[in-house]
């Protein structure tokens, strides 16, 4: 703003459309966003890769150990984070706002994302949201804690992968 002060003049209000908008038919105000904690989780077992035929079964897979660590944080069947300290009660006012927003947007809340779908030999398989209920969808996006893996390290590209037990697995978590 300081760099553009001569062009903008005296700025009294800045609107940032970064948290998403319900639609482009109305102006939306963000009242609820969950916080974020990010970090890198690394499980290192070996100092270098070794032949899997020689080592697997004796040397634990860094990916398996990573899964065990993540299972302490998240129920992999439901996606629910396990530590109670990540959860809070949604205030009544915010719940009422979520209901009002859901009444306006309906299924657009979930349909706005580019879901993958494939014809699997005649039976269609679809990736689906964790809920079809618009109110719950809003609460899951803004109030409920969730775990996302946003990056990975320690994996070769598929075309370069061989019979090697990898020395480590690292995930960027958010």
Where on the chain are the PLM-derived regions?
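Contiguous, small/hydrophobic- and glycine-enriched helical/loop subdomains that border
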Residues: 1-14
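Acidic-enriched catalytic cores of C-N bond-cleaving enzymes acting on peptides and small amides
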Residues: 6-9, 22, 26, 31, ...
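Short, small-residue-rich loop/turn micro-motifs
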Residues: 37, 42-47
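Short small-residue beta-strand/loop micro-motif enriched in glycine and branched aliphatics
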Residues: 47-53, 158-159
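Short beta-strand/turn micro-motifs at beta-sheet edges
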Residues: 27-31, 158-163
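Short, hydrophobic beta-strand segments
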Residues: 41-43, 169-174
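Acidic, glycine-rich active-site loops and adjacent beta-strand->loop/helix elements
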Residues: 1, 17-22, 45-47
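Short, solvent-exposed beta-strand/turn "edge" segments of beta-rich domains on protein surfaces
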Residues: 58-59, 159-167
């Amino acid at each position: 703003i300081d760099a553009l002060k001569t062009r903008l003049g005296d700025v009294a209000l800045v609107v940032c459309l970064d948290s998403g908008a319900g639609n482009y038919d109305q102006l939306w105000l963000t009242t609820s966003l969950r916080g974020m904690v990010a970090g890198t989780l690394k499980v290192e077992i070996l100092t270098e890769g070794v032949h899997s035929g020689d080592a697997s079964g004796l040397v634990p897979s860094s990916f398996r150990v990573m899964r065990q660590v993540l299972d302490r944080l998240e129920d992999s069947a439901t996606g629910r984070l396990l530590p109670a300290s990540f959860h809070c009660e949604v205030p009544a006012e915010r719940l009422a706002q979520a209901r009002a927003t859901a009444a306006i947007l309906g299924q657009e809340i979930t349909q706005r994302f580019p879901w993958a779908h494939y014809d699997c030999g005649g039976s269609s398989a679809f990736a689906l949201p964790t809920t079809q209920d618009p109110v719950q969808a809003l609460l899951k996006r803004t109030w409920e804690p969730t775990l996302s893996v946003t990056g990975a390290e320690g994996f070769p590209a598929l075309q370069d992968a061989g019979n090697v037990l990898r020395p480590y697995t690292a995930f960027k978590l958010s």
